Swiss-Prot record:
This is Aspartyl/glutamyl-tRNA(Asn/Gln) amidotransferase subunit C. The gene is gatC. Belongs to the GatC family. InterPro entries: Asp/Glu-ADT_sf_sub_c, GatC. It comes from Corynebacterium efficiens (strain DSM 44549 / YS-314 / AJ 12310 / JCM 11189 / NBRC 100395). Keywords: ATP-binding, Ligase, Nucleotide-binding, Protein biosynthesis.
Length: 99
């Protein structure tokens, strides 16, 4: 079973913009390694002859007809927005330049 390193967890944390302590990096490395082991065990299950399914129940859902309903105009939607520019909602920047 491949071992997940502390550096790999640190790299993933950076990509996810998470600030993790050294203790958390070590803890998560062990937990992710355990998860990979469990997934590996599931992959090794003999499923020969088992019919693939997306849900354990065979209940079929019924779809409703598409109905056109009145919605807000763009002006109505933007009317109560705290900040609008060029007909769009303005939101605070969360990513730095070049990220």
């Amino acid at each position: 079973m491949p071992e997940i390193s502390r550096d790999q967890v640190a790299h993933l944390a950076k990509l996810a913009r998470l600030a993790l302590s050294e203790e958390e990096l070590q803890q998560f490395a062990g937990q992710i390694d355990d998860i990979v082991g469990h997934v590996s065990a599931v992959q090794n299950v003999d499923a020969e002859g088992v019919e693939p399914m997306s849900h354990p129940h065979s209940i079929m859902t019924t779809m409703r007809d598409d109905v056109v309903v009145k919605t807000l105009t763009p002006e109505q939607a933007l009317d109560q927005a705290p900040a609008v520019e060029d007909g769009r909602f303005m939101v605070p920047q969360i990513l730095g330049e070049g990220d």
